């Protein structure tokens, strides 16, 4: 019999505290065995002594062993029964297991009629196992040592369950020793059940304790007779169930990134623990739902100690005080967005109502709000008088981890205004007022000292100061950036997204000009101009109206392949979508802007026919402005400087601002050169609408002169420092009258005669266009008059002669209009034209020096030539030298 099969307590039975040699000798005497030779542990001899004394001792030991076994079985069965009785109230994993009917050897319980594989660590100074003994008889000591090293530290014996107790002879049924064979961890019942069922039981326990906590809170609130929770809104502690069983305190204060509790949870059952009669409840960590429930307070929010909701927005309470001065006036916000929410408050120090923008309690929104604060402080510092229609930032602070921005309180936005009109649009006069203010705003933002890109210009971000007036403010600089510090590629709302952003090309302040053009059309028509449902649909809607984008943009666009395909010849065409909806779109440019605006039909849908301020002339100017704003190429797109001087926006009683604020230090670093006032003998160089052509101005609208060449014109300008500057007139041009002064230092190298011919030819072309527009308007008026006359005749039965006489008078008025136009053409071709021009220039220069020049508009309807406008046109003539 191998001593390794004897239980540890039996091996140590009868031993006294002495040396190892004496213990071995006493053991040999007790079992009537020869002493163990420590020099050769593999030597074994048969027992030939009487077993009478040993049998008596073995019987007593067997009785004690059975008693201990029964006690151990009772304790474990009791422990299992207690665990099963606490099944709904604990996180202890349960698994089916038969009652224990065998002893515990090396912390493994053997079941009846079941063979198990025992793994024991190698013990020193004891006899070898049966397998080892079978390998060593007759071997020299050297081979035995080598074989012993090959066996390793572990050995396995397969024995029948229930056998192995002392006094029961048996023959080993073990197979030959298999070296380094370990038990598969997946066969272990505890580990297998833990890995498979931990998620299931975790979810069951979370749901159970959550419902239990809700019921307990409901009972507490009913017993107290008031709403649950305290007034301070601090996180309520867990119930007694959590406080008893949760022995690990929660120290993490991060409410945004919670970890799963089972990742750091201790083992639920310790199979190697000694038997005990006391039930040990294992320690548990809080799960996500339990932690949220622990933090829930009377305010109803699971985050930020109950002050936030699930979207990380602050939970507003009427009467709450922010920053010791702002009193919240409502529980509901006046506006919400991806950034957070806006609420109405009362400033107790300044005795006024304000709007507080509460940013979400997330790091990304917090960082972006800091950029918004920086840009607003920069704009407010350069616009202290608030002339450029940007919302005023009154202050900012942090309240319970939320960054709060305090603004002036404003009224409705432009989208609300459209809803009030049932999406029929506002009048052209009101759209003109909005365009004037927004043009000044973009002129201010694009100045060299700021170079701010709003990046989210839309009707929702343009608010009225007063509901009864047309004054506006531009808000929401949360997505804004500066030209040299672009952060995002995915910007702008889809309806107002520019082509360069859709194509992934680098963008600048011109993207806001595209958005402004879309806004103006929507404000008048009542519907978005490009209402795309996706980026692909958005690009196709743009192509329907404006045609295909320039090839130069498509060649460099990283996202061009998303919208267009390319032939072998390098020609782009619209890409067929996955759904096969290519035929639902019209051909490029088939949807005319002329028809959308209703230039000749009395506005969109004919709703403005006959109304004052909605003539064909007004719509023609409006269409020209929109076309310049909606140019594909940002370089060809009209700049804010020209927008505020466009004939659609210029009014007789208004004076156009001279120039945006600028410093001379960064003058040459910008795309547009802003030159200072005449005191420094400098002028302004602006970009022309296109490259390689000579353009002249017609009431603020720049048209290509017939027969103009693409050769650049060398222009020289004198400075105080004596520096000379050569400007390519193919891309830039001098515009003296737009600065309200004339600089006599310009010297043009092109012959005067050629320029004068170009100027005269341009004037003829302009007059022809004006005549056509006037004739169209007269025809519409005549049609209206005829309809009115027919109605009157039907009601009053007037004689036919009266209507014919009226038609005769109207027919006589038409040649009179033509005579006036012919007189104007003859006047411009008069031989004394240059003499009159010099006289006018002298008078205008005197007005310019006194800053009293105010250009007037040309009345195209009646064909009258205004003298002041004529003076303005002559100032644009480059041959004038005062």
From Swiss-Prot:
The active site is at residue 456. Its cofactor is Mg(2+). Residues 1-42, 843-869 have a biased composition (Polar residues). Keywords: ATP-binding, Kinase, Magnesium, Nucleotide-binding, Nucleus, Olfaction, Sensory transduction, Serine/threonine-protein kinase, Transferase, Tyrosine-protein kinase. ATP binds at residues 334-342, 357. GO terms for molecular function: ATP binding; protein serine kinase activity; protein serine/threonine kinase activity; protein serine/threonine/tyrosine kinase activity; protein tyrosine kinase activity; transcription coactivator activity. GO terms for cellular component: nucleus. Residues 64-79, 290-308, 747-761, 789-810 have a biased composition (Low complexity). GO terms for biological process: positive regulation of DNA-templated transcription; sensory perception of smell. CDD domains: PKc_DYRK1. Residues 328-649 form the Protein kinase domain. Disruption phenotype: No visible phenotype. InterPro entries: Kinase-like_dom_sf (IPR011009), PKc_DYR1A/1B (IPR044131), Prot_kinase_dom (IPR000719), Protein_kinase_ATP_BS (IPR017441), Ser/Thr_kinase_AS (IPR008271), Ser_Thr_dual-spec_kinase (IPR050494). It catalyses: L-seryl-[protein] + ATP = O-phospho-L-seryl-[protein] + ADP + H(+); L-threonyl-[protein] + ATP = O-phospho-L-threonyl-[protein] + ADP + H(+); L-tyrosyl-[protein] + ATP = O-phospho-L-tyrosyl-[protein] + ADP + H(+). Residues 220-231, 816-827 have a biased composition (Basic and acidic residues). This is Dual specificity tyrosine-phosphorylation-regulated kinase mbk-1. It comes from Caenorhabditis elegans. The lineage of its organism: Eukaryota, Metazoa, Ecdysozoa, Nematoda, Chromadorea.
